[in-house]
């Protein structure tokens, strides 16, 4: 059986380029581990790889859903595992590339999700919020997960509902899943290589600032506007993700274009910091520094590692 490779790290660190290069070298196929790239029509703001950037490598879980369709960790876990099995059954190497920490965690340390879908759970807590108010919602979280309740302000109802949803789906406090408590990191199977990409903070932030500017220049605002014109609600989860929610602020006249750019870059930098914090908690990640021109060295190292893994697995 071919090994499974997982590539993680903060946004703008170079995961896509490495994943494609590695897939081309190893006859691999890529599974996206990104919670926004899974949606059709959300291309620029999600930094979805273009056909040229995909380099003729088959990609899975890109453009898989309509923006109005819900997508949960449980769904990702199921679809990604199906894709992994499909790829390995054909003698290819599955490579998961993404920065959505909970998605990746669900593949490495499979969570047992409740049989009922999370949409009904989310609907229940949304109705509870409407009827009882945000303070009561916050108290419900405090009963189930005191650490998350301490971390989240009562006004942050979206994240509170998310935490309550995960408590019910996994049977564990969301803070435990996030890593706020001592976590058990069991050894990885010999057929799995867990790769993390990083870079000095100033380089990551510089790349992020430049990428945000490039997204706006490439038509992020127009892409967002078109989605609204097509009838998609601005309250949809993917349209509340980084980039799209900032474009909406500008489109609705809440901020000027320079102010939109400032908070877009700031929030993306904060997001990258949270991503690094999440993945650095896991001692099983093998880290590589993606300083300029280092892709070739990382690629050669990973090809050698994978060759050794494949011989051991076989």
From Swiss-Prot:
Stretches for region Interaction with substrate tRNA: 34-37
UniProt gene name: miaA
Domain of life the protein comes from: Bacteria
GO molecular function: ATP binding; tRNA dimethylallyltransferase activity
Species annotation: Desulfitobacterium hafniense (strain DSM 10664 / DCB-2)
Record: residues binding ATP: 9-16
Known cofactor(s): Mg(2+)
Keyword entries, A-Z: ATP-binding, Magnesium, Nucleotide-binding, Transferase, tRNA processing
Function of the molecule: Catalyzes the transfer of a dimethylallyl group onto the adenine at position 37 in tRNAs that read codons beginning with uridine, leading to the formation of N6-(dimethylallyl)adenosine (i(6)A).
Binding-site residues for substrate, renumbered to this chain: 11-16
PANTHER family: TRNA DIMETHYLALLYLTRANSFERASE (PTHR11088:SF60)
InterPro entries: Dimethylallyltransferase, IPT, P-loop_NTPase
Catalytic activity of the protein: adenosine(37) in tRNA + dimethylallyl diphosphate = N(6)-dimethylallyladenosine(37) in tRNA + diphosphate
GO terms classed as biological process: tRNA modification
Site (Interaction with substrate tRNA): 100, 122
UniProt family annotation: Belongs to the IPP transferase family.
Protein name per its UniProtKB record: tRNA dimethylallyltransferase
Subunit annotation: Monomer.
Enzyme Commission (EC) number: 2.5.1.75
């Amino acid at each position: 059986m071919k090994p499974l490779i997982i590539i993680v790290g903060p946004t703008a660190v170079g995961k896509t380029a490495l994943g494609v290069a590695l897939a081309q070298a190893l006859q691999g196929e890529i599974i996206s581990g990104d919670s926004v790239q899974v949606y059709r029509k959300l291309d620029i703001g999600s930094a979805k790889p273009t056909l040229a950037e995909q380099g003729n490598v088959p990609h899975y879980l890109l453009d898989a859903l309509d923006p109005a369709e819900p997508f949960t960790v449980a769904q990702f876990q199921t679809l990604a595992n199906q894709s992994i099995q499909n790829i390995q059954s054909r003698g290819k190497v599955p490579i998961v590339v993404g920065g959505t920490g909970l998605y990746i965690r669900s593949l490495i340390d499979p969570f047992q999700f409740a049989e009922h879908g999370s949409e009904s759970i989310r609907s229940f807590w949304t109705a509870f919020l409407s009827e009882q108010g945000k303070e009561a919602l916050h108290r419900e979280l405090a009963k189930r997960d005191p650490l998350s309740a301490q971390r989240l302000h009562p006004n942050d109802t979206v994240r509170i509902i998310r935490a309550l949803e995960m408590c019910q789906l996994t049977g564990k406090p969301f803070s435990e899943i996030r890593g706020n408590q001592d976590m058990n990191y069991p050894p990885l199977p010999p057929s799995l290589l867990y790769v993390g990409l990083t870079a000095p903070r100033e380089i990551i932030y510089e790349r992020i600032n430049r990428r945000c500017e490039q997204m706006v220049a490439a038509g992020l605002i127009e892409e967002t506007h078109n989605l609204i014109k097509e009838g998609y609600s601005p309250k949809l989860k993917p349209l509340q993700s980084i980039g799209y929610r900032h474009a909406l602020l500008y489109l609705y006249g809440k901020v000027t274009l320079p102010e939109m750019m400032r908070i877009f870059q700031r929030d993306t930098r904060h997001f990258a910091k949270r991503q690094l914090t999440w993945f650095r908690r896991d001692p099983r990640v093998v880290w590589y520094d993606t300083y300029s021109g280092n892709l070739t060295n990382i690629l050669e190292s990973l090809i050698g590692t994978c060759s050794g893994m494949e011989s051991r697995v076989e």
